[in-house]
């Protein structure tokens, strides 16, 4: 049994550097290896992957692991499934995260979306008229982050700036024990404080993911 409580989790976010780092291919391995120019990606860099040839990996964010000549590990990524990752990856691009801004004075986050949707119907030849369902798409995932109002905090102006630009960012959740989750998507922020008697004023950041998270496990 390994129950884990979220107490101590800290969210943060970072802009994405516009400079594109070409990758000629990504291997089928766990963790996957990206072929890049020597010294273009360092161990510990957080990167977004743009890889049209493997849609299951496109728009996902992770941390770079060990480097070797011309390759770097993409931690938390397993590309050995030949259904999800058929053939070869083809060329793509990595983009590094800028400096992360950590959030504090956090309330309890809430998540929504990700629910599987279905097509429902019956088959004409089935005399029982039994209904069948086929999975279609999943709803977009959102994370809502309550933040207690304090305009002097570094994150306040940084969130306002990100909201105004409307550009995708990398969201990070540092969990107790060293595990880290990374997402890539859009972050909006309402900096106007909520007001209720005998309660701290609050603001709300809302993140919409462009792809599933990547979990990088702690040592």
Per-region residue spans from a language model:
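Residues that flank catalytic or metal-binding motifs in active/ligand-binding sites
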Residues: 60, 141, 167, 183, ...
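Oligomerization/assembly interface segments of phage tail-like spikes and tubes
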Residues: 121, 132-151, 199-214
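Small/polar beta-strand repeat architecture
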Residues: 3-7, 15-29, 38-39, 53-128
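Short beta-strand and beta-hairpin "edge-sheet" elements
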Residues: 172-218
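Short acidic (Asp/Glu) patches
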Residues: 123-131, 188-191
């Amino acid at each position: 049994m390994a129950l884990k409580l979220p107490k101590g989790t800290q969210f943060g976010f970072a802009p994405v550097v516009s400079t594109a780092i070409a990758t000629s291919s990504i291997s089928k391995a766990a963790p996957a290896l990206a072929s890049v120019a020597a010294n273009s990606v360092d161990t510990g860099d957080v990167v977004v992957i743009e890889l049209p040839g493997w849609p299951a990996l496109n728009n996902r964010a992770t941390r770079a692991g060990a480097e070797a000549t011309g390759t770097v590990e993409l931690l938390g990524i397993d590309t050995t499934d030949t259904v999800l990752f058929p053939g070869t990856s083809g060329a793509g691009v990595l983009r590094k995260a800028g400096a992360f801004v950590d959030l504090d004075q956090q309330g309890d986050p809430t998540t929504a979306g990700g629910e599987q949707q279905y097509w429902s119907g019956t088959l004409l030849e089935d005399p029982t008229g039994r209904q069948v369902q086929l999975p279609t798409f999943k709803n977009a995932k959102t994370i809502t982050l309550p933040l207690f109002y304090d305009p002097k905090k570094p994150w306040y102006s940084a969130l306002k700036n990100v909201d105004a630009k409307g550009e995708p960012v990398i969201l990070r959740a540092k969990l107790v024990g060293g595990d880290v989750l990374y997402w890539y998507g859009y972050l909006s922020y309402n900096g106007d404080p909520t007001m209720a008697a005998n309660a701290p004023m609050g603001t709300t950041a809302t993140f919409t993911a462009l792809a599933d998270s990547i979990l990088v496990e702690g040592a």
